[in-house]
Amino acid sequence: MLHGYTQSGPLFHAKTKALEKSLQKAFPQVKLHYPTAPNRIRKADIPNFGNSNPSNDESKSNGVEDEPDAWGWWRRRDDSSVYLGMDDSFMFIAEVLKSEGPFDGIIGFSQGGAAAGMVASLLEPRRREAFDTAEANGGRKYPESFLDDQGSWGGLIHPPLKFAVSYSGYGAGTHPLYKAFYEPKIQTPVLNFLGSLDIIVEEKRSLFLVDACTDGRKEGRLIYHPGGHFVPSSQGQYVGALIGFIKDIIDGGSSSKEDSVENMNVPF
């Protein structure tokens, strides 16, 4: 479970308790992991932080340099479309995959939804070759932290994920650095939830991720909820859609009872 920008694992856990309970009821063996991103987000990185925090001036006058408990998987470099801190996040996620996995799937919100799509992409067969090709044209290098030439999964540290879910997520855009995440299209089944009243993430940015996924606009893979920038974790219709998606993926791809939802591995 990958939290959004300026959140933390414990905060995201608290906000999605209802969703966790529903998933545990549907999948009794499920256990959700809530890592906190490695990049500390400072006050200066948060738009209008001082205006929205009345205690900010008091902290300054007392000489207290309190920073918010805010973290991110990356942050923008000025107003550009280049992200800083991404390498640290991939190294951190790789350690979680190795120490806590293997995982069946990954779920993320907002920036975490964007990261979830990237992680699903990175673990796909032949994605490394796409990065090698893109690197020659200004693309970023495939993360070395995801490589294991002695491993059992085609030189990677973890097998391909069975599914990914993005709530209010987005794609990194058309910058050459990030092209290989999305070209060729992400083959992992991805479910995208978008809020019709979301004013934080532009719809076109979210649809970039949708269209970068194979079957991204297939029925049941793109779902709008009548709200804003949040996870509809207590609304039965949308929780049911998530559970149905996961069941279809796990049961639909199983060849034996051992692979069924009752024996589902720990999702990320």
Label every model-predicted segment.
Residues 107-116:
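Gly/Ala-rich beta-loop-alpha elbow adjacent to hydrolase catalytic centers
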Residues 2-4, 168, 194-195:
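The conserved beta1-alpha1 loop
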Residues 233-246:
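Post-His helix in hydrolase/transferase enzymes
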Residues 14-16, 177-180, 202-212:
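Short alpha-helix in the alpha/beta-hydrolase fold that links the catalytic acid
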Residues 171-174, 196-202, 228-230:
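Acidic catalytic loop of the alpha/beta-hydrolase fold
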Residues 1-102:
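Serine-hydrolase catalytic machinery in alpha/beta-hydrolase-like enzymes
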Residues 213-232:
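Catalytic histidine neighborhood in serine/cysteine hydrolases
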Residues 186, 191-194, 198:
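Short beta-strand/loop motif that positions the catalytic acidic residue
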